């Protein structure tokens, strides 16, 4: 399937250890930073999702663009995040997003 003309795709990504953020550069020239602690990283066991152990900086540095730019992939962690969801502020399953929104304070 061909990409839509206006589809925002990742062209590069990297982990910034100093700020513990994921940087994503898109095909529209924009760059986005996402704190990695906001990303829900889980594994499926016995039909349940459980958090993975806290990843090391070395593991997080091994991130790449995947699926023609439609996803970000950590192979060693077996974690995939869709770019369109990340750009929409969706960092995990609905349950995770509810927990995240409960921790946000508005000044």
Where are these regions (language model features)?
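Motif-centric detector for short Cys/His coordination patterns
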Residues: 1-107
